[in-house]
Amino acid sequence: MSGFFRKVGDSDSESDISSSEEELSELESGDEQPKTTQPAASRSRFLKGSDDDSDSDDDDSDDDDQDSLDSDDDNGERRTDGKKAPTSRFMKGAADSDDSDSEEEVKKVVKSAKDKRIDDMQTIVNHIESAQKSSDWTSINKDFDNLMRSIERQRTLNEQIPAFFYKAISQLDQYLNESAAKEKDAKKKMKAPVAKAMNGMKQKLKKVIKENDETIARYRSDPEGFEAAAEAALSAAAAPADAETAIAKGKKERLAAALDSDANDDFQTVGRGGRTETFTSEGLFKSLTAIMEARGKKSTDKNEQIRKLHDLSGVADSPYKKIRVILALVAARFDYNASATAYMPVEMWDSARKEINEIVALLGKNRSYVVREETEDYDDEVERVPGQNGEKDVVAVRGSIISFVDRLDDEFTKSLQNIDPHTTEYVDRLCDEKKLYETIVLAQGYFESQSETEALSRCTMRRLDHVYAKQDVIIKALESTLGEAAKTFESKLFPSAVRVAEQDGPAVLVRALCTYLYQARGVQAERPRTRAVLCHIYFHALHADYHVARDMFLMSHLQDAIQLADVATQILYNRVVVQIGICAFRNGLIKESQVALQEIFATGRVKELLAQGVQKQNQFSTVTPEQEKLERQRQLPFHMHINLELLECIYLISSMLLEVPNMALAGNDPELRKRVISRPFRRMLDYTDRQVFSGPPENTRDHIMQACKALQNGDCKACIELISDIKIWKLMPGSQEVKLMLAKRIQEVGLRTYLFSYSAYYESVSLSHLAATFDVEETVVKAMVSKMIYNDELAASLDPSANVVSFHRLELTKVQQLAATLAEKANSMLEQNERLLDAKLGEGKEQRSGAGGERGDREGGQPGGRRERRGGSAARGRGRGRGRAQQFQALGQKV
C-alpha cells in the first residue's frame, strides 16, 4: 500500500481526502498527501504505466491494489448508475487499514495515571510562570494551592516528586524576593488585594521551602545536574518494556548518557543533553581563568559559575590551588545577588560563611601562604610552591579576607532589614548570628597572627558591633559557641572565652576591644576610634553605669565635631544620647534624663534620628526617592531598636516631674510663665485641658496626662496608681525598683507643687501635717523646704521650736504686675527702634564709630557701641544657640 500512496501523491487531482488517510500516509511514507481523486479508468491506466520503475514486490502490491480498486469501481458504478465514483469508494480500501493504524496510534498515546498526574502538575507550573509575567498574585496563589495538593497526592502514593517542582519553587521564591524589593522602591504601591495575595503567597512559600530545604538547596547548587539525576532515577524506576516506541529518541539518549556517565571520563551530563568538561587537577588553572574571564558578563550564568567552581574545589590537590579556587568561589557567591536592596539567599550565605571558615583554617594550617590585597605580579596559571621556582618562603595570594567578612556581615544585616520581624523566620535568621560571630572571631585571630593592623581593626570593629548593645548573658552565650574558632588562633590581645564567662567578663571583653581601637593610628582609624568610644559609652549606659558613661561622653568632646561624621556614626551618637537619658532615669536622675532626651524629642523625628523608620511622605516632604532608598538601607535591624513607647514614657514622666512644680511656681507671674522646660509636654497638656470629656486612659500618653492632672490637684496616690498601671514598664530592666523610685519622686514633687500653689493662703503650716499629707518622712520635708528657701523659690522661714514653716507675703499686686508688663513691652519697643535706626544709618557707621555720638555717649562713653539688652532672649536663655550645648552643659553638672 505504501507504493500506491506514493504514486497517488504525484498526481495533480483536486478533490480532498479524509483526515484518516492523511494520518495513514504520514505514518507510511511521510510524503505530501493527494488532494483529489481521478475516475476509475484513468486511475488504473496511470497506475499501470507508473509501475515500470518499481521492483517486483511493488508490482505485486500495485496489482493487488488495482484489483481492489477495479472491484470497488464496479460496485460504485452499479450504485451510482454510471456516474463518477465518489471519494468514499476510493477510501473504502484504505478505511480498514486506517482503522487498524488509528487503533495502534491510540495505544501509543495512552498514558498511565502516574503520567497524567505528572502532566497535570507540569500544566499548573506553566500557569504559575505565565501568571508571574503579569504579576497576577491571585492566580499564583490558586495555582500554587492546586500544585501542593497534587504533590501531597504524589507523596501519599509514595511516588517520586518531579524535579520541575523544586525548580518552580526556587524560581517563585526568587521572583517573590524581586517583587518585594521593587515594591519597596516603587512610588505607587500595589493595590490592597494584590498585596494581601502576595503576602499570603510569601507565607505559603516559606513553609514549603522550610519543609524541603535540603532538596531545594541541592537543586540551587546544581540545577541542571539535579534535573538530569531526577530524570535518570525516574527512568530507572519506570523501566518500560517498549521504551523504544514510547519515548522519543533524543530523550532516551540523554537518559542513557546520564546513566552511563561513568563510562566516559572526558564528559559528563549536566542536563538538556549538554556536556561540560570534567575538571582535573592538571587543567585547574586554565578552567579557573576561563571562569574568571566570564565573570561579570551579561550572558554569564551565575549558578553555573558557582557549580563549576565548587567542582574545581573538589579536584584541587594543593593548598595553593585550594586557596585560589575558594577565593574565586566566595566572590562568585557574593556576585549572585547584585541588587542593593534584596539580600542573599540564606543557603548561599551559609555556604559562603563555611567557605570563609575553610580558607581561614587552611591559611592557619599552612603558614607559608598568605592572602593580601596588594601583592607582586605573578603568573595565575602556574603552581606556586614556597621556596621553589624563585618563590619566597611565604607565598602571597591576591585577595581580601576582610572584605569577605565585611560583605558577609552586611548581607546578614540586610536580610534582617528585609525579613518581617514579627515572624519566626526573623528569629530563625537571628540564630545565625552566633555562626557569623564565630567566623568574625576566627578571622580576627588570623589577622592578629599575621600582624595585619588595618584588617584587624576592621574585624575588631565588626566584633564590637555585635556585642556592645547586648546584655551580659547574651554575650556569654555568643562566646561559649566559639569552640574551634578560639582554639585555632590563640589571641593575646583579647580575653578568652573562659575569661568572658566570668561575672565581669563581658565588660572586660568590650573594654579590650575598645582599647585596641583607641590605640589605632592613622586617618583610616579615626572613624573606628570614634565608633569605639560611642559603643563603649553605650555599653556602660545599658548597664546603668550613668556617671561612668556621662564622664566618658563629656571627656571625649564628640559633641563638638559629630556633625562632620558620617551618617551611620551620627545615628550611633543619637542612640548613645538616648541611652544615657534612659540610664539617668533608671538611676533616679530625673532632670538629667529630661535634658538628655529634650533635644531629640523637640525635633519630632525620633524614629528617623534613631534609624528605626523612614520619614512619612507628604506634600511638604523634600525627600527624593534616592534619599529614601539610602535611609532604608541604613535602618537598624528590629532586635537593635530602642522601644520608642518606653522612650516617650520616660521623657513625658521626666517632663511632668519638672514642669508641674515649675507651672505652680510661675503662677500669675508673666516673666516666670515664659520659662518652659518642655514645649512638647506643654502642648500635650494644653490639648488635654481643652478636651470636654476625658475617658479612661487607653495608652501610655493618656496615663501620663491624667497623672499630671492628678498631681496638679495634689492627689499623689492617684498619680502613682496611673503611672504604675502603664504596661510598658515590663520592658524596663528593674521595673519594680523604677516604680518605687517614681512613687517617692511623685510624693516629693507633690509637696513642692502644694507649697508653690497654696503658700499665699497660709501664714504658717506644720511640718508634721505636710509629712502626713504626702506620706513623706518629716526629715525629708524639712530638707525640701530648706532647699526651696535657699534657692529663693519659697518666701518663707523655718521655725524649729514650733516645727512650722512661716510664709512671707511678697506677692505683687495687680498694679505692680501690669507695670512690670508695661516696662517689658517698652523695653522691647526701644530695642526694635534702635535696630531700625542702625539699618537706616548703616552707611555712616564708620563716621559714628570714629566721632562718637549721642548714642555712643549714652552707652557708657563707648563711641558707636550698641546698647546692651536688658533681659530679652539673651537673659532668658531662649536664643538659637541653646540645644545641644545646653544639653551637654546640663549633663556635666554635678549630681
Swiss-Prot record:
Keyword Nucleotide-binding attributed: no
Biased composition (Low complexity): 884-895
Residue stretches of biased makeup (Acidic residues): 11-31, 52-75
Family per record: Belongs to the eIF-3 subunit C family.
Listed PANTHER family: EUKARYOTIC TRANSLATION INITATION FACTOR 3, SUBUNIT 8 EIF3S8 -RELATED, EUKARYOTIC TRANSLATION INITIATION FACTOR 3 SUBUNIT C-RELATED
Gene3D superfamilies with a match to the protein in the record: Winged helix-like DNA-binding domain superfamily/Winged helix DNA-binding domain
Classification via PROSITE patterns: PCI
A Pfam family the protein falls into: PCI
InterPro entries per record: EIF3C, EIF3C_N_dom, PCI_dom, WH-like_DNA-bd_sf, WH_DNA-bd_sf
UniProt subunit comment: Component of the eukaryotic translation initiation factor 3 (eIF-3) complex.
Protein name per its UniProtKB record: Eukaryotic translation initiation factor 3 subunit C
PCI domain boundaries: 638-812
Location of the region described as Disordered in the Swiss-Prot/TrEMBL record: 1-108, 838-895
Keyword Protein biosynthesis: yes
Compartments it resides in: Cytoplasm
GO molecular function: RNA binding; translation initiation factor activity; translation initiation factor binding
Cellular component, GO, one term: eukaryotic 43S preinitiation complex
Basic and acidic residues bias: start-end ranges: 838-860
First-listed, main subcellular location of the protein, grouped into a coarse class: cytoplasm
Keyword entries, A-Z: Cytoplasm, Initiation factor, Protein biosynthesis
GO biological process, one term: translational initiation
Protein's job: Component of the eukaryotic translation initiation factor 3 (eIF-3) complex, which is involved in protein synthesis of a specialized repertoire of mRNAs and, together with other initiation factors, stimulates binding of mRNA and methionyl-tRNAi to the 40S ribosome. The eIF-3 complex specifically targets and initiates translation of a subset of mRNAs involved in cell proliferation.
